[in-house]
């Protein structure tokens, strides 16, 4: 067993088989407005 990858396998790979996917943020960061509202809600 060698540590080097099999380059022949990589060159044979058919990129057209891959599907284009839209990446979507699963847990987007809150906006500055949201953070400010939460800070104010916590203070009162």
From Swiss-Prot:
This protein's major location comes to cytoplasm
Q: Where in the cell is it found?
A: Cytoplasm, Cytoskeleton
One Pfam annotation reads Thymosin
Q: Which InterPro entries match?
A: Beta-thymosin (IPR001152), Beta-thymosin_sf (IPR038386)
What are the entry keywords? Acetylation, Actin-binding, Cytoplasm, Cytoskeleton, Isopeptide bond, Phosphoprotein, Ubl conjugation
Q: Region labeled Disordered — which residues?
A: 1-44
Q: Specify residue ranges for compositional bias: Basic and acidic residues.
A: 33-44
Phosphothreonine is found on: 23, 34
Where in the chain is the Glycyl lysine isopeptide (Lys-Gly) (interchain with G-Cter in SUMO2) cross-link? 12
**GO MF terms held by the record:** actin monomer binding
Matching entries from Gene3D superfamilies are given as:
Single helix bin
Residues recorded with modification N-acetylserine: 2
Q: Which residues carry this modification: N6-acetyllysine?
A: 4, 12, 26, 32, 39
Q: Look up the domain of life of the source.
A: Eukaryota
SMART domains given for it?
Answer: THY
GO biological process annotations for this chain's record?
actin filament organization; regulation of cell migration
Cite a GO CC annotation: cytoskeleton
Q: Phosphoserine occurs at which residues?
A: 2, 31
User: In which family does this protein belong, per the annotation?
Assistant: Belongs to the thymosin beta family.
Purpose of the protein: Plays an important role in the organization of the cytoskeleton. Binds to and sequesters actin monomers (G actin) and therefore inhibits actin polymerization.
Subunit description: Identified in a complex composed of ACTA1, COBL, GSN AND TMSB4X. Interacts with SERPINB1.
Q: What is this protein called?
A: Thymosin beta-4
Q: Which organism is it from?
A: Notamacropus eugenii
